[in-house]
Amino acid sequence: MALDRERLMQVLDRAHSGPICEPFKWDTEVIPQTIAAALRKYDLVKTCDPANPVNQSDELADRFFQAGFDVAVEVGMLCLDTQRIIKFSREEIRYGLDAAPAEFTLGEGEEKVVFRHRGLDDPFPPVWVAPLSIAVEEPLFIPIVEGILRERVVDCLEGPSLQTIWGSKLRAGSPYELLAGKLQADLNYEAIRRAGREGIGMYAVGTAPTHYGVLGGYGIPGGYKPERDIVLLLTPVEMKTTYEVLHKLCQTYNCGGITYGGSWSMIGGYAGGPEGAAVSCIACTLLLYTAYQASNGAS
């Protein structure tokens, strides 16, 4: 699904015209107070049962979803660089969900794989992506990726990330990172060749602590391919974005690609306990599909 320019510009414009909020106030007042109010409104306080961590109550799930939806509408997404809030209406968030594809593909040839929306007890098989951009030493990169890809259960590759580039320390936001984006693509392709998995889809770019890794490795000759791969847009919690993430979004638009939106609320953080973290995760996910036009994502 190609990214829509009007929706993209809407996000960028609101990042520069929305209500002002300092990050400290966002973290210590806006987020905890709004989530706590939603928990009370939907009677979700202390509903987490440690003895039953995977609660299968449809009614409880519905209340959590409505609470998360309310939080997404009320709070929006804070752009840290401008300290302005990108707000979305309830209708805009619903449209963002409706516009997300029911299915899409990554990879090419024999390695093409279908991602499809799966409901409860859905028999359609899940897609396995491995691993999660964990930093490894440079000499170990190719052997690790090759070993992973020799396991046929792996459908797509994110791969590890790099700590160094040709022996030099990799520094975020520096020219090293721009080079590292292409180097990671090169190393992945060599490991793919050795494992006999040519055409496998990839998540781009693991070695991108800022936007430069994506600019240096995605949509360029010999780099990650927009027609086959997906761009990682990992956004800060709770419900924040940055110029770095928006640069990646714009590069994806320029190259005609698709995005994965990710953001992980943690128990005990600004969202509070397990119930608050669950509500925050739902709100974040709704905003990721709305702001980033994600084809795939989670919080």
Residue ranges and their predicted role:
Residues 1-220, 234-244:
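Metallocofactor- and cofactor-centric catalytic cores in central/energy metabolism, strongly enriched
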Residues 207, 217-299:
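Glycine-rich anion/phosphate-binding loop at the beta-strand->alpha-helix junction
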